């Protein structure tokens, strides 16, 4: 019997962008604990860098697929690809957030409607979409982990819309857990 805590477990890691990503550090820990991992990249702009990073650190055979968390079709297609590798998922990491640069600084009062919609969609609603898509595959003791920050509870200068989005993410987490 293996002494690795996650031996035989499958983790889906959403949000690795580079070697400084919190998602990358979590994926390394899960991998070292024995988990089999499946990753995403977000769009062609990040594809080559993410593929190189994942394959150099986790092996050439580790699956990495395109995923646009703002598209239900993309989310569903991603999990169809995941199903080609496994019929169960034990842990899902949601490490995704976005707010347009202009919505992070200055007065929060100047936040535009489009920036608000985009930020909440990508930073918070994506957890709901990913959870719904993975739910049929989740093991009985499965876990979904989402990344937040102090700015969800306290005002942090130059965090503005991201703080509101993280507060929404935390609320989504509570309702999903209920």
Residues covered by each model-derived region:
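Catalytic loop of short-chain dehydrogenase/reductase
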Residues: 15-24, 97-136, 140-178
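Short-chain dehydrogenase/reductase
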Residues: 2-118
